[in-house]
Amino acid sequence: VVHDRLNVEIFRGCTRGCRFCQAGMVTRPVRERPREQIVSMVEKGLKRTGYDEVSLTSLSSADFSGIENVISEVMTQDSCSPVSLSLPSLRVDAFTVDTASQMQQARRTGLTFAPEAGTWRLRQVINKLISDDDLFAAVESAYSQGWRRVKLYFLIGLPTETDEDTLGIVDLAEKTLEIGRKYHKSPSVTVSVGGFVPKPGTPFQWFGQNTEQELLRKIYLLRDAAKKIRGLKLKWHDSRATVVEGILSRGDRRLAPVLEKVWKEGGVFQEWSEHFDIDLWKNAMEEEELLIEDFSYRHRDENEVLPWDHLSAGLHKDFLWQDWRDALNNLGLEDCRWTPCYDCGACTGYGIEHVVASAVPPAGGSQGTGAVSQQGNEITVSISQTGTAKDLQVSGVNE
């Protein structure tokens, strides 16, 4: 009912390396669908469903190699007129003038960009290597092509975050509105803020989550700064729900009776705000003699055995730890689709590799612009003689 549109998945996986993103870490490598197959799926899907909106889905749709060609071919199909086209999960450094120009042929919907953090320094920490200028160029492309509504998504409670980083969210939104006013009388910007919850299998799995009170303080800081700006709307996620999400995110088997107690006390549809009751969770934790601090708020050290260590999505734990240390030093890693392998384990551990529809990177770069870590990965290569030396070719040995 919510997603009342045709959804076509254009690729799986993501190698941008955002350190907060579990999906981007555990679904590596990138596997792109052939362009011709995507166009065919859209055409057939529209004919069979009667939908008038198409969403080209992935973890970062504008990163699809040759995305402008895909949009162009989709929009020239007879079955796609008049149809609205959306690209969810847009990275601002991959949204170009060409992309905006192609999309403006369709019926316009709002555009959502995810800078995630309010300052360049903090975006280096989380490896979301997009500059302020990247954001401003993207929104200028959108506003100049006729869009009036832009939504920006951010996280608060990220590692090393300061009040300056938090207030940078409002500063970016205000400058985005200024760009919009160059093209429209009443542009609008909606800022959506969520509390950061560390996830297993990511470099931030060792980080101690912000408390409910600290998240609330940052929300009030944003609210007070945003209320005087015309055209800016601020939304935020319930910090109490973020507490429960943190418990469940890095919990272990001891939470099984907690879940059962919450359910027995009527805790159903807890993801719905009108049904959510944090007291059910706090009471159940107390009855089981468990502390929220132990699950959510404390930092872990390198040698701690984590509840999910026996599970593997391919990434080496030592790679994640080094990436965590790089984060604390504001060091970024570029997209490994277009750079040498970092030996994270996702590909080398399974003998697989990236599958891209085009050998040319997206026009937006997809390369990253941050300070790149000089930390390499040591690989030991063993060579042994298993046959008669006379059978070896000189060229083979040299290679």
Q: Across the structure, where does each feature detected by a protein language model lie?
A:
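Active-site-adjacent "gating/activation" loops or surface patches in catalytic cores
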Residues: 1-19, 101-113, 121
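Canonical Radical SAM [4Fe-4S] cluster-binding loop centered on the CxxxCxxC motif
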Residues: 2-36, 342-356
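Glycine- and acidic
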Residues: 3-8, 19-29, 51-59, 118-125, ...
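Conserved, mostly hydrophobic/aromatic
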Residues: 14, 18, 38, 87, ...
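Flexible glycine/acidic-rich beta-alpha junction loops that bind and position SAM and/or redox cofactors
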Residues: 16, 65-66, 95-99, 121-126, ...
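Conserved SAM/AdoMet-binding glycine-rich loop
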Residues: 44-194, 198
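Two-metal-ion acidic nuclease core segments, chiefly of the RNase H-like superfamily
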Residues: 216-226
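Radical SAM enzyme core and accessory elements
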Residues: 228-399
